Curated annotation (Swiss-Prot):
This is Uncharacterized protein TP_0851. It comes from the Bacteria. InterPro entries: DUF4954 (IPR032533), DUF6819 (IPR049208), Trimer_LpxA-like_sf (IPR011004).
Length: 724
């Protein structure tokens, strides 16, 4: 585009071309409709005020198009220029302070073009402000360029009247080729992106999502950018086509373009030094600081991007933090952590509560003829230091990858497992139920830390943070079946007569311990995959199922005053065992399918209606979860659960709960029994002063209190009359 030469009288006018102005309207009709406040009594400047303004070094070719509202002190405007229709609300001699930054109200050394300015604002050294509606008590200081175009989308993936499809901004999560593209919109959450990106085979569903997104935003040209009340923007270079919510704080940003910054006085969003953000939607209460580069992205509420993060073509769920690293083409559910500057995450679906360690390279994009690989990981995925994974891989929930190079694709169906590449023996090794067996403290800490980190005031969706929940329980059921098959196969391959896994464990436990259990279909290679401690893992999985199901049922009975007879009318075989992690919210698979069908048939007309349905699904979650626990326990018992049988399982669960609490304490104590942990301290007293003792550990104390309550609950329901 070439530099254009304009006539002076047209400067500041004709924001919307005549072809896009409806009959009977003018170029300001949308601008006037954007103000949420009661109409002000705008008036023209008096001759005395114009004289004062000129004396103060101000310039305007059309002073009659500068309107003000009383009280108005013209002496507070100095060395500034105005063009087009400029409206300035009441302006009095005041000071505005934000933290330690204090400035006087007024407009100095600035240029305003067709803008509305709210009450008692401070605008200083802003070289170019064009087509913005500025709220009350806003501070704008030392901004090079702040402008809005007539076709601004403010981060939404829509096209305006008269535009071609080619200009639409899309995001390509999970796959770099664009085959899973979605249209971002204000209010989008990880669940929306999941529905859209992960069901591409449903053509009608895709069409509904596209039309809903396009219809959610007004396609008319001429909307102004907004900087809402109590916002502070200072020392920035270029800001173009950005809407800022109330209480936004921006300092030292290099470039902000085509964004919506959602913010409120209760959940202010902050953007800091050296940041460059283009084509995105930022949630409430976010912090984006120190050299972050993000392009084509959606941030959930209470997210943080820091220290040079590169986030491109990605959707990040609520309560997540990414620092220093590179994340491309990723769909990440809530509570993700990635802190180190030498990790990257490429083309992946991470289902939240996850952690990518230093040196982790998740996704080698060049192991196929095209950059079309994908990685899918369940909740709680944790890649160890310097681990390397290649596309395509799939992981169950709470899988810990040790720091190794994994040369082939992986499909790990065992939740709570430890995976390692044994290079000496040239084999992959998996320890199912590792966390339950050897790191119970980490399981408990996970749940507690996520609850503590949830600072959201705006909660669009109910997110499950409990480690043991319907999704992980379903994975345990599937893993248990695979483990049983592997044990039975190993038993026969060792020259024994065929037996069920249960009989092998009960009748030949010692002999079974000596037989290696191998798996197939886990790694895309010719080498073997060995299961570590398969019998212990089998028992652990069964204990988890019993403990979880009894705990869930009895908690439900306590909350609702219902009993086991409430479920006996249900055929457990008709209750779905499979649940879907829908952006952090857990939904039974059959209800999830109904949701998709209702969207396809047009029952839900907008994303707002879909979000309401998320709430409706959340409202039945506790009942659905209890029903699921009943079905799982019936499957485990191979019969319907009645009051006496439930009593038996409750007695077993008491033993498991005591083991669980003991293991939490025991796994924490390991840190104190390790002699190498002592070498940086002069004596145990210094160590305890720094770290505290296991007995003082708040997590352990809280867990013991919760366990006492649970055991008391179990005790109350031991007698069959209470269960029936």
């Amino acid at each position: 585009m070439r530099v254009q030469i304009l006539d002076l009288p047209s400067f500041g006018y004709h924001f919307i071309t005549q072809t896009h102005i409806p009959r009977g309207k003018d170029e300001y009709y949308l601008r006037f409709s954007q103000s949420a406040e009661p109409p002000r009594a705008w008036r023209p400047l008096s001759k005395e005020e114009i004289h004062t303004l000129i004396q103060k070094g101000n310039h305007c070719d059309t002073w009659h198009d500068v309107l003000v509202a009383d009280p108005f002190d013209a002496s507070l405007i100095r060395n500034s220029s105005f063009a087009g229709l400029v409206r300035i609300a009441s302006l009095e001699r005041r000071l505005l302070r934000y933290h330690d930054f204090t400035v006087p109200t007024g407009i100095t050394h600035s240029t305003l073009i067709s803008c509305d300015v709210g009450e008692n604002c401070a605008i200083h050294h802003c070289a170019y402000i064009s087509h913005y509606i500025i709220g009350n008590h806003v501070i704008l200081s030392r901004i090079d360029e702040l402008c809005t175009t007539n076709h601004a989308k403010f981060g939404a993936g829509i096209i305006k009247d008269g535009e071609q499809e080619a200009v639409r901004i899309t995001i390509d999560p999970l796959n770099e080729t664009g085959g899973r593209k979605i249209f971002p919109f204000v209010g989008m959450i990880a669940a929306d992106a999941f529905l859209w990106a992960c069901h591409r085979d449903r053509t009608l569903l895709m069409q509904r999502f596209e039309s809903m997104t396009q219809q959610q935003h007004d396609t008319r040209r001429g909307y102004y950018g907004t900087i809402e009340t109590q916002s502070v923007i200072k020392s920035c270079r270029i800001i173009k086509d950005v809407c800022f919510g109330p209480g936004s704080y921006v300092k030292g940003a290099n470039k902000l373009k085509n964004l919506t910054v959602q913010s409120s006085l209760q959940e202010p969003t902050q953007i800091g030094e050296g940041v460059e953000l283009v084509n995105g939607v930022i949630g409430y209460g976010c912090r984006v600081f120190y050299g972050v580069k993000a392009v084509r992205f959606v941030l959930g509420n209470n997210c943080a991007l820091k220290y040079g993060t590169r986030l491109i073509h990605s959707v990040l769920g609520d309560n997540s933090t990414i620092s220093c690293c590179e994340v491309l083409n990723a769909l990440i559910f809530p509570y993700h952590e990635q802190h180190h500057n030498n990790s990257f995450l490429i083309a992946a679906l991470i289902r939240g509560q996850s952690n990518i360690a230093a040196g982790s390279t998740i996704g080698s994009n060049h192991n196929t003829r095209k950059n079309d690989g994908e990685i899918i990981a369940g909740r709680g995925f944790w890649s160890g230091l310097a681990s390397t994974l290649k596309h395509n891989c799939r992981f169950a929930s709470f899988v810990l990858i040790t720091g190794k190079n994994y040369p082939a694709e992986l499909d790990i169906p065992f939740p709570f497992s430890l995976v390692t590449n044994n290079e000496r023996e040239n084999r992959l090794e998996i320890m199912p139920a590792y966390y339950w067996l050897y790191n119970m403290y980490a399981i408990e800490r996970n749940e507690k830390k996520f609850a503590a980190r949830d600072k959201r005031k705006t909660k669009t969706q109910t997110v499950e943070i409990s480690v043991f929940a319907p999704d992980t329980i379903g994975e345990i059921e599937n893993a248990l079946a695979l483990l049983d098959s592997a044990i039975e196969r190993a038993w026969v391959n060792a020259g024994n007569s065929a037996l069920t896994a249960e009989d092998i464990v009960l009748k030949h436990p010692t002999k079974a311990q000596t037989i290696p259990v191998l798996l197939t279909g886990i790694e895309h290679s010719t080498r073997s995959t060995l299961v570590l401690k398969p019998l212990e893992a089998r028992k652990a999985y069964r204990d988890i199922l019993i403990w979880y199901c009894t705990k869930t049922l009895l908690s439900f009975f306590e909350q609702t005053t219902r009993c086991i007879s409430h479920f006996t009318s249900h055929d457990p075989k008709t209750i779905t065992h499979n649940w879907v992690n829908m952006g952090g919210q857990l939904v039974p698979e059959d209800k999830f399918e109904t949701l998709l069908q209702n969207i396809e048939t047009g029952k839900f007309k907008s994303w707002h209606h879909i979000h309401k349905e998320y709430d409706a699904l959340a409202a039945t979650y506790e009942t659905d979860k209890a029903l699921h626990a009943y079905a799982v326990l019936c499957s485990l018992a191979r019969t319907r659960i009645d009051a006496p049988l439930l009593c038996t399982y409750v007695q077993h669960a008491i033993t498991i709960e005591k083991y669980r609490v003991t293991q939490i304490h025991k796994t924490r104590c390991k840190d104190y029994l390790n002699p190498f942990r002592e070498i940086t301290y002069r004596n145990p007293l210094e160590r305890n002063a720094v770290l505290g003792t296991p007995e003082e550990d708040q997590l352990i104390r809280t867990t013991e209190e919760e366990s006492a309550h649970l055991c008391a609950l179990y005790a109350r329901y031991i007698a069959p009359p209470h269960l029936g």
